[in-house]
Amino acid sequence: MQGDVYDKDKQTVCPECGSTELIGDYERAEVVCAHCGLVIDENLVDMGPEWRAFDHEQRDKRTRVGAPITYTIHDKGLSTMIDWRNKDIYGRDIPARNRAQWYRLRKWQRKIRISGATERNLAFALSELDRDSSRLGLPRSVREAASVVYRSAVDNKLIRGRSIEGVVAASLYAACRRCNVPRTLDEIAEVSRVTKKEVGRTYRFLTRELNIKLPPTSPVDYVPRFASELGLSGEAQSRAIEIIEKAMEKGLTSGRGPTGVAAAALYIASVLLGERKTQRDVADIAGVTEVTIRNRYKELTEQLEMGVTL
């Protein structure tokens, strides 16, 4: 039976067995106990739309609500736009005598959407954020989180005296750490047209002023992405994570860059499993030097007594 969990106030417990798991079957207008099957109510009112749909395609066509609210657009996606195709609601062409009027309306409507200084700032910054996110291959959840951080910075008047690009980059870096989608400062700076130093300085400023608490980045967070880009197997990825966890237990990762530790662990795992990759390949993917790979490799193999040779 298709239905939803019934949560109305008038009946929350089955009078027969005492179960609180009640199912609302809107097709039959019944409320049924999921435990014993007792029909509790036969006059359930369907609060859904008045139209009917017999498959998903019809449902999509007849749904009249808009897109969900998103923080990645300056107006949160709540405003409307006049279509540029010069067609009315029924798909018919707009008469030629009215097209000049539609052009003027469209022009004014665009101006009205972005009228104030704050809206212009958000429109530019969020488009920049979307561009940087696309180049970094970040998921939508990270973009939403970064947009929230940037909006908080605007609301708290933290933008003045700083470049929009720098604040956007710092917001992205904070969102990546919050969502456990790690990206290095070098990667953020490369796509954001600001220096690594500025990104780091602005990031520290935002986290301090907005009281954002973020856990330190773990080398484990970088392993899946590096392993995928290197074409290593899932077994190699698991082995690298085991190596990192043992190293963390012994305190070998303290004061070490997480990308360097992750890269060295993956290199060791590739050697152990016969999926050998060159140090240059691993270093290029991780954004570290070959010297860093060799140093971390030596520390891990000696301290963990792994007995692996280059």
Swiss-Prot record:
Sequence repeats lie at residues 127-210, 221-302. A zinc finger (TFIIB-type) spans 9-41. Stabilizes TBP binding to an archaeal box-A promoter. Also responsible for recruiting RNA polymerase II to the pre-initiation complex (DNA-TBP-TFIIB). InterPro entries: Cyclin-like_dom, Cyclin-like_sf, TFIIB, TFIIB_arc, TFIIB_CS, TFIIB_cyclin, Znf_TFIIB. Gene3D superfamilies: 1.10.472.170, Cyclin-like (1.10.472.10). The keyword Transcription applies. This is Transcription initiation factor IIB. Zn(2+) binds at C14, C17, C33, C36. Keywords: Metal-binding, Repeat, Transcription, Transcription regulation, Zinc, Zinc-finger. CDD domains: CYCLIN_TFIIB_archaea_like_rpt1 (cd20549), CYCLIN_TFIIB_archaea_like_rpt2 (cd20550). Belongs to the TFIIB family. NCBIfam families: PRK00423.1. GO terms for molecular function: DNA-binding transcription factor activity; TBP-class protein binding; zinc ion binding.
